[in-house]
């Protein structure tokens, strides 16, 4: 209990103090940026909000481009489009309350389209939890049905670790979005960098791709051979498995129309 009370007291005061210039300490927002950079993210799509301001400071320091749009739905769709076109992790960052709810349609689209995007959302401070604070909503509960992974982060020491975990889930098995809620005081708080858990990039992500069921492949071949006017509809899995060149050769060899 004493440890919990001390942590809450620390987050409350750390939000108000001027940020340190000591290279041996790091804020939660800067840990977000470091973790995103380790995941290969070079751009975030966002609409500026007070709950997430320290993430922007971290992104500037890490050389991550900030695309500030006029509505969070645009930011979510942009992150989705970025992921589809590049094959990399798309990232949308929203403030608490309406910032999160405005992004729901874009995240739901990514979920149904199997697009790997990471949605990072702000939240009111832990010290104001369940007190009806500014723009306080149950974001995790709302995002759970339309994401593969949805969680809150309640410790600055775990920020980078949780960002990496959420990013991993975007690419684990069937691709899709993840949601991570980070309270304002967790982002603002500074800790010794030695206490932060920062996973090494690429050391934990699955790289194994399973092959299709041979029986299904045989069935598909029979359908194509016997079809009078065949056409092929290619899904997101073609991009996810990096099989686009094979798909192109396939439809060209059969000389049939294809749609992606």
Enumerate the predicted regions with their spans.
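N-terminal alpha/beta PP-like core and its mobile active-site loop of ThDP/TPP-dependent enzymes
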Residues: 2-260
